[in-house]
Design a protein with these regions (language model features):
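Sec-dependent signal peptide recognition
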Residues: 2-10
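Glycine/tyrosine- and acidic-biased, solvent-exposed loop/turn segments at the edges of beta-strands
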Residues: 14-276
């Protein structure tokens, strides 16, 4: 009888142990199973979003997919031996929001597929775009050129100095100035020579530069802020003025058109499950 009870007790203990299962933990970018580096396909949550991906000896390796709450794809990231080599971000409608390539090239898109900005890593050159697809601003380490919506140059900096673009500075009776190119006013300058407003061809504000504060603000033709920069950071917006891409010091944040923060990395990980 005692042997039977002992055997039943042993089986009960073994069942309890089995019910406990393996303890998975994602720590400092490494996946562990009962304290040992794990290998396999896993599913987990970062904040409110589900993530699926493969780990080899604890390190992320291969394709990782992150999903919105409705199940649509939010991000695809490719890892090789723990290092992320490329990333694609998506709107909820399935259109591409951003592409961060292995060679360092970057492209960001509106949800209709038109380009917002591109960065050529080889040339170390960035291009921002008007809503009609023409370049808004092209810049590199030596030169920055600003265009209106008709692809006409309204300002050019070379080595931080303004260059001659064939424009004439005209002083008005109230002490302010106008910068005229051909028959078109391309910029207005206040009497203190501190604030300059570059203009679209139809007169709307294009870029405001405040020399006293160092702030710059770019505008869509509808008057909403396209991009705003100041010391230590900048923010790039959607057409309706909502934030799309924000830089604050060393941190970067990307938002979809509904204002949802697109989470990258493995922060706030919960609900880890091994799929195979």
């Amino acid at each position: 009888m005692k042997k039977i009870l002992s055997a039943l007790l042993l089986i009960f203990v073994m069942l309890l142990s089995a019910c406990g299962g393996v303890k998975y933990e994602l720590k400092d970018g490494l996946m562990f199973a009962d304290g040992k580096e794990a290998t396999g396909n896993f599913e987990f949550k970062t904040g409110k979003y589900k993530v699926k991906g493969n780990f080899v000896n604890g390190l992320p390796d291969g394709l990782f997919e992150e999903y919105y709450e409705d199940g649509s794809i939010m991000a695809k990231e490719t890892f090789v031996n723990g290092e992320m080599t490329s990333k694609e971000l998506y709107y909820k409608n399935g259109n591409l929001l951003g592409n961060f390539a292995e060679n360092g090239d970057i492209k960001l898109y509106y949800d209709d597929g038109s380009l917002i900005l591109s960065y050529d890593a080889e040339k170390e050159e960035y291009t921002y775009y008007h809503e009609n697809g023409n370049p808004f601003m092209i810049g590199n380490s030596n030169e920055t050129t600003l265009y209106n919506e008709n692809n006409e140059v309204v300002s050019k900096l070379r080595d931080d100095d303004l260059t001659d673009i064939g424009a004439t500075l005209k002083k008005l009776d109230d002490g302010t100035f106008e910068l005229v190119k051909g028959n078109e006013v391309i910029a207005k300058i206040d009497a203190n020579d501190e604030i300059i407003n570059y203009l679209y061809s139809t007169g709307e504000p294009l870029l405001k530069v405040n020399e006293s504060t160092g702030e710059t603000e770019f505008f869509f033709k509808n008057g909403n802020t396209f991009m705003k920069g100041k010391e230590g950071g900048s923010i790039l917006n959607y057409r309706d003025g909502k934030p799309l891409y924000e830089i604050n010091g060393d941190s970067e944040t990307i938002y979809n058109e509904e204002g949802d923060k697109i989470v990258g990395g493995f922060d706030l990980v919960t609900d880890i499950k091994k799929l195979d």
